[in-house]
């Protein structure tokens, strides 16, 4: 459990207000990070995350599945640097997304660097997303909000209505 202080909540809300103006549907320009990321996602996204940002990575996967109605995967960067890297030896429709923290452990930073070198040498396109600076609550809330919007924009770009969830309704009706 993360110990949360009142100032952590206030910082999170202040960051969220700033982000809201930048990524809302009132700003459909290239400066909208959520929209730009949605345009870049192709194939099957594989979201790599470090320790501490697992919740944001899993939430992004779930949001892409529910809103954009697309397959998505998630994996810890440590595992990606072990067994997960082997899968990249074959051609793939997978698009790696590297969800990085501003204060990742030094060993994690080394893993990111090595993974990017491998992708570059193998001519595998990838996208890096960096958390904001601040407390862990602010980072998680900021990333979740940004990536939720990304999943909605991805749905709209793909001409998919993000609101109905017929398959979930089917399961629930049984």
Tell me the role of every PLM-derived stretch.
Residues 1-174:
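A SIS-like phosphosugar-recognition module
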